[in-house]
Amino acid sequence: MTRVKRGYIARRRRTKIRLFASSFRGAHSRLTRTITQQKMRALVSAYRDRGRQKRDFRRLWITRINAVTRENEVSYSYIRLIHNLYKRQLLLNRKILAQIAILNKNCLHIISKKIIK
């Protein structure tokens, strides 16, 4: 029986996987089986955390807006601010409001006072 020389396709596939896992530690960057397992695990974590990141940032923005709105008036809160914004049909999302709250608190106080009236 003659010797069969395998092509370069499997090697190319493995090197592509190794490039993905080159920053991993230990056997996770050297052994092909563990590389494939860790690659799948990394991609699952990345997919899961993209959704989690959106939730976390929204929570952060809400916390920042609430902290700044409660500084002046104790009774006035985040939920009342958002409700009044919708009533007045002002299109300011939470990200923009949080940036205004951090960079220019007076501007947010002016906006909230105008909305109340």
Swiss-Prot record:
Superkingdom of source: Eukaryota
NCBIfam families referenced in this protein's UniProt entry, alphabetically: rplT_bact
Task performed by this protein: Binds directly to 23S ribosomal RNA and is necessary for the in vitro assembly process of the 50S ribosomal subunit. It is not involved in the protein synthesizing functions of that subunit.
UniProt organism field: Lemna minor
HAMAP family: Ribosomal_bL20 (MF_00382)
GO cellular component term of the entry, any: ribosome
Gene3D superfamilies: 6.10.160.10, Ribosomal protein L20 (1.10.1900.20)
Subcellular location(s) per record: Plastid, Chloroplast
PANTHER family: 39S RIBOSOMAL PROTEIN L20
Main location: plastid
Alphabetical keyword list: Chloroplast, Plastid, Ribonucleoprotein, Ribosomal protein, RNA-binding, rRNA-binding
GO biological process: ribosomal large subunit assembly; translation
Family listed: Belongs to the bacterial ribosomal protein bL20 family.
Annotated protein name in UniProt: Large ribosomal subunit protein bL20c
Keyword Cytoplasm: no
UniProt GO MF annotations: rRNA binding; structural constituent of ribosome
